[in-house]
């Protein structure tokens, strides 16, 4: 058996221009075949060569020709050319007047399908009418990467945290919760999302308790200026987006809303103390719900689940409610926001505003009968990718870039909440779920 680059005998291996790189790769590939498959008279020729004592010399010459052909391949081709997928399996090799079919092809490159690339997203967070900013937002696209032989998948993490009493629990959740979810996701091969999220939230709650005992007590700058950090906590609404699923874990009164085919679909339920099942759970644990400016646990906390708030345990728990939703082609976007938005804006109104904003930016919101000139169209298409990078602002240590349209949509929602006299901090994350797929050669 020999690895050869088979060409016409009269053609020489010469350098090829850059523009013919794709044609060259498709026309001349690396094959593994026996000499008898190439030429029916190969066996006879081999015997004659052996008798003449030049068999080894002939093999060396073929190997030399192959190395020359391999070295003459274009080495400066662009990434776009390198991303071409070689999928032709029917190969015909010509040798003068004869043609050889049924050749066993061993491709030197694998076609890898990379699904669900980094989604477009935008974020806006404002203090509003509050004196202190106690919200926190975490954006970690591609925080988990899994690869099989023929595919790569990326999981994306988005979280919104609404602190109360002070901001340090929300800030701690922003720093650590995605790492805990990542550890659980990599260690759990069965992808049991409910158990994974429950373990992650429980670990986060325990870390907050230990961190408060060792670090915060001496330097606590709580809203009430008290050294007792047990009265500090945070809500958490977290979404992990995979190519097939949308996983939402919620603890508190922040909310996740999916827009599917123009309709608002809530993926979480607020944990209010007067919710029937939460009220029963609190009373069974020996607690009470007192109405003091709304329903509150022991007349203090206006939510029945949160991370932290040690002085209210076991009535207030950190166990999240987890929903797993199958993704469809009708999914448009996902909104994660604190109660500063949802207290004054309905799910339907928020989805309508974001949908109008995204459709306008993508050109779908153009009025009926309005045409677009070819020059204008090409100019907008040319600027579309540029706006995603240049017109957006960076977030995070790794320079993650937000999408301009999603950012503007989240800003509009915060402005709407303030216009409706929201009295709380307002934080909004908008994630575009419209699919983008890319094929490339690894």
UniProtKB/Swiss-Prot annotation:
Annotated PPM-type phosphatase domain residues: 120-433
Cofactor (UniProt): Mg(2+); Mn(2+)
Keywords for the protein's UniProt record, in alphabetical order: Cell membrane, Cytoplasm, Growth regulation, Hydrolase, Magnesium, Manganese, Membrane, Metal-binding, Nucleus, Protein phosphatase
Residues the record lists as binding Mn(2+) 1: 162-163
Annotated knockout phenotype: No visible phenotype under normal growth conditions, but mutant plants exhibit reduced sensitivity to abscisic acid (ABA) and glucose during seed germination and seedling stage. Freshly harvested seeds of mutant plants exhibit increased seed dormancy.
Tissue specificity as recorded in UniProt: Expressed in shoot meristem, vascular tissues of cotyledons, and in primary roots surrounding the root meristem. Highly expressed in seeds.
Gene behind this protein: AIP1
Pfam family, one: PP2C
Top-rank taxon: Eukaryota
Organism: Arabidopsis thaliana
Protein name, entry field: Protein phosphatase 2C 3
InterPro entries from the UniProt entry: PP2C (IPR015655), PP2C_BS (IPR000222), PPM-type-like_dom_sf (IPR036457), PPM-type_phosphatase-like_dom (IPR001932)
